[in-house]
């Protein structure tokens, strides 16, 4: 349980900053601006795709193919791709906002800021991935914490002093860009521009594929949901803000389980009991955050209750799903487990395209239910055969 709390706290630090930042921006400037968090949420999946290929894939490729420059090459190519991709999205920000069925007059400046901030975060994560594979975790965590703190302090302090959205965005982005440039120069020592894109995708293909599906889910799902009106935009933003940290922290269950499985220290009941306790804490924190934030934004109570209830229901499945899926992936069949994980995400993607404001959360529940059934049946059968 201590390890779950320790790893969960590390995740909490990096996840909490953007949440509290957008909550405070909403309080300082305009309540509507909090919705930028969900407006640009799909674009974070693009960051996941780029980091998967040019970060994780490049580092694994370097180790397997004995190319010392692979990680550096990945950072350089990933940075170039990121600048082009997010730059084009920022230049077409109005079209993006219109596609998401939101008001360009309200969201244009801060949406552009958020897109460029995700660009800078992508470059940061490419560099952090290299440090993780060099086993410089403490250094990586310090850099990540420093970036988030600089972003938070600069954005909030400038917003408190200056109400001009354009100036707030420019000042914050300039400081974060300087941070990234300094970090980039210090992190890149030698490059040879050799890069095997096929291998880099192959070595982290599951994560990359899931990020692609997440992008489709949130891009079309949120666009679909937002088309039903402002009350759904506010409700989805509210539900996302009070559950996003907890979803990130719940990955600690998988992390701890995988460590013990690999080291032959795995005890299912011990992990299950700890996961139940940990998930209970996460659900409690969701309810508390909801009670604290609700009076500030006053979203439609019925709609919010539906979204939050379904999130909590999905949280309740986590201990039953994650531990068994980790065990099956490592000890049973990585291929079969991966295929079924992808099937679950395909189900989620298809349902997210349905014409209902609840499409994304319904897809999420259906995906988890499929994994729950698969994990229970396969785990039970596998344990009988060993």
Model-assigned labels for residue ranges:
Residues 142-189, 356-381:
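Hydrophobic alpha-helical transmembrane segments
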Residues 1-16, 20, 111-115, 138-145, ...:
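Hydrophobic faces of transmembrane alpha-helices in multi-pass small-molecule transporters and flippases
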Residues 102-127, 246, 298-324:
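Alpha-helical transmembrane segments of multi-pass membrane proteins
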């Amino acid at each position: 349980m201590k390890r779950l709390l320790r790893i969960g706290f590390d995740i909490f630090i990096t996840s909490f900053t953007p949440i509290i930042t957008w909550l405070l921006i909403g309080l300082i400037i305009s309540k509507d601006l909090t919705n930028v968090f969900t407006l640009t949420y799909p674009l974070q999946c693009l960051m996941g795709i780029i980091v998967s290929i040019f970060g994780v894939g490049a580092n694994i490729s370097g180790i397997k193919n004995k190319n010392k420059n692979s990680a550096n090459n990945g950072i350089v190519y990933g940075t170039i791709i990121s600048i082009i991709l997010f730059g084009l999205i920022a230049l077409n920000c109005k079209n993006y906002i219109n596609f998401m069925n939101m008001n360009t007059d309200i969201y244009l400046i801060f949406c552009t800021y958020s897109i460029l901030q995700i660009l800078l975060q992508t470059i940061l994560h490419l560099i952090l991935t290299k440090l993780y594979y060099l086993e410089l975790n403490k250094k990586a965590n310090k850099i990540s914490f420093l970036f988030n703190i600089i972003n938070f302090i600069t954005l909030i302090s400038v917003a408190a002093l200056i109400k001009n959205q354009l100036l707030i965005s420019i000042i914050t982005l300039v400081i974060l860009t300087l941070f990234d440039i300094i970090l980039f120069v210090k992190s890149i020592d030698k490059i040879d521009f050799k890069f095997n894109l096929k291998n880099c995708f192959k070595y982290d293909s599951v994560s990359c594929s899931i990020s692609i599906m997440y992008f489709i889910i949130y891009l079309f799902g949120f666009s679909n949901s937002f088309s039903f009106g402002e009350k759904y935009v506010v409700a989805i933003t509210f539900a996302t803000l009070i559950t996003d940290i907890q979803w990130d922290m719940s990955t600690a269950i998988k992390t701890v389980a995988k460590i013990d499985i690999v080291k032959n220290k795995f005890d299912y009941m011990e992990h299950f009991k700890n996961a139940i306790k940990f998930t209970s804490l996460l659900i409690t924190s969701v309810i508390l955050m909801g009670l604290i934030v609700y009076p500030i934004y006053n979203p439609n109570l019925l709609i919010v209750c539906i979204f939050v209830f379904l999130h909590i229901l999905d949280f309740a499945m986590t201990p039953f799903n994650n531990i068994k899926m980790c065990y099956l992936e490592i000890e049973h069949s990585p291929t079969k487990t991966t295929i079924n994980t992808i099937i679950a995400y395909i189900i989620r993607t298809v349902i997210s395209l349905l014409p209902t404001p609840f499409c994304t959360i319904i897809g999420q529940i259906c995906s988890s239910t499929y994994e729950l059934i698969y994990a229970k049946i396969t785990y039970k059968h596998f344990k009988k055969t060993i």
